[in-house]
Every structure is written in structure tokens, then in C-alpha cells.
């Protein structure tokens, strides 16, 4: 017989979204917000833990004098994201382009996916993977989801093969656009201060990488991806 915790999970899934037999209902946002605000001061500010992130050696800022902004009131609704309607999504232009090479930031594509390169930033390379068809991350068909996993592994290995890179950081947020998109940050080698979750913050302050250096990195990565996974290099990487 399955353990009780497994049975509770099974009843949760088998009785609709929140089954009657689930031993505790999921917390509402009102309850969550009230619990957060109960720990805030009179200005709505949360305290910074003495052993929190500002104590990490990878934190980009001096901790002295640092304070959090006040927690804002609950919004009535979340603002709609760009591309909620498929006909207004940026992916329409991707599919209608006569040649992928005409899309300036695109460096790789196959029948279902594309990879674009970000504007020059502080790290050696930032790439973005997205499906050509209009899907959010949680609505990808099984076939596309399986492809995504394979591309992510191959792309990560290609990025980590760059001589200036030790690791690839993978990020998915999705608050700005409704179309699925995943970011790949190249973390510089032998710079341990840039490791971990603060890399995206450091990226804003590091000097911009020259365009020709960025393009050379993108070209090496996409050619490696073509060799190990497939697809074709386009645009700056062709």
C-alpha cells in the first residue's frame, strides 16, 4: 500500500484541482500576503536576515545601510503579459519571415525552435530559446517539451565549451511575455565572485562585451549545437 503522503497526493489529483479529501487546502494569496505583512515593520519593510543574501561573498553590494523597499499592497489582478493573444505575439513575425537570417538577433533554428542572442551585456553570452509556435512554458505539447529538454542539454554543453566560460545558468521567468522563453547565461570561468543566483545582477554592472566578441561566442556555440543536436546556424552565427 502506498504511504499516506502519496495517497494524499493521489487524492489531490483525482478529485479535481483541490480534492475534498486533501488534508489541507492550498494557501490563498490573501493568507500568504497577511502572513508576510505580519513580519513587516510600520513602513511595510521586511528585515534583512543577519545571515541572509547580503552576507554572501557573491552579493554585488556592500551590506551596510542596505534596506528592502516596502511591500506594496496586493494588486487587484496581475497585468497582462505581452503576447497573451497568439495573434499579437512576437512569434508571428518569426514564422512569417522569408528568411531567418533577416531576423537580426536569431542565431539558430530548426523546424520547431529558435535561439536568439541578447544585446551585448556583461557576461560572455546570453542566449534565449523559444518555440516557433505560440506556447507558454506550461502549455508546451509533450513533443515540444521533450525537444526542449534535449536542446537545453546540448546548448548548455556548447556554452560551457567556450574558453571564457565555466558554467551555464538557466533562467525562466515569464512575467514579461506570454510566449515560452528560457535564458542561458554564460558564467565566466575563474571568477567565483560571479557564481550563483547573483550572476544576472552582476551582468548589469560588468562592462559590455564587444559585439564582435559576442558574435564569435554565439557562432562557436551554435555550430557546436548543430553538430551535437541538429538544426542550422543563421544570421550572425551562419
Residue ranges and their predicted role:
Residues 127-151, 202-210:
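Short histidine-centered catalytic/ligand-binding loop motif
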Residues 146-162:
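Active-site helix/loop of acyl-thioester processing domains in fatty-acid/polyketide metabolism
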Residues 101-115, 137, 141, 147-151, ...:
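Glycine- and small hydrophobic-enriched segments that form the cores of compact globular domains
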Amino acid at each position: 500500500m502506498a504511504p499516506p503522503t502519496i495517497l494524499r497526493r493521489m487524492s489531490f489529483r483525482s478529485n479535481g484541482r483541490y480534492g475534498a479529501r486533501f488534508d489541507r487546502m492550498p494557501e490563498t494569496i490573501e493568507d500568504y500576503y497577511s502572513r508576510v505583512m505580519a513580519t513587516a515593520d510600520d513602513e511595510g519593510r521586511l528585515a534583512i536576515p543577519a545571515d541572509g543574501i547580503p552576507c554572501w561573498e557573491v552579493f554585488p553590494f556592500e551590506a551596510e545601510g542596505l534596506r528592502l523597499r516596502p511591500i506594496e499592497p496586493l494588486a487587484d489582478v496581475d497585468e497582462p503579459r505581452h503576447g497573451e493573444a497568439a495573434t499579437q505575439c512576437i512569434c508571428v513575425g518569426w514564422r512569417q519571415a522569408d528568411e531567418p537570417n533577416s531576423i537580426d538577433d536569431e542565431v539558430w533554428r530548426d523546424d520547431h525552435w529558435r535561439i536568439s542572442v541578447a544585446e551585448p551585456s556583461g557576461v560572455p553570452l546570453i542566449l534565449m530559446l523559444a518555440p516557433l509556435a505560440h506556447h507558454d512554458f506550461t502549455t508546451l505539447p509533450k513533443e515540444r517539451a521533450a525537444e526542449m529538454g534535449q536542446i537545453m542539454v546540448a546548448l548548455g554543453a556548447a556554452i560551457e565549451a567556450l574558453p571564457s566560460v565555466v558554467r551555464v545558468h538557466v533562467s525562466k521567468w515569464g512575467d514579461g511575455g506570454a510566449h515560452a522563453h528560457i535564458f542561458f547565461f554564460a558564467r565566466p570561468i575563474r571568477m567565483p565572485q560571479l557564481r550563483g543566483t547573483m550572476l544576472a545582477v552582476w551582468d548589469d554592472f560588468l562592462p559590455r562585451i564587444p559585439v564582435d566578441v559576442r558574435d564569435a561566442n554565439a557562432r562557436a556555440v551554435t555550430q557546436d549545437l548543430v553538430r551535437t543536436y541538429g538544426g542550422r546556424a543563421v544570421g550572425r552565427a551562419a
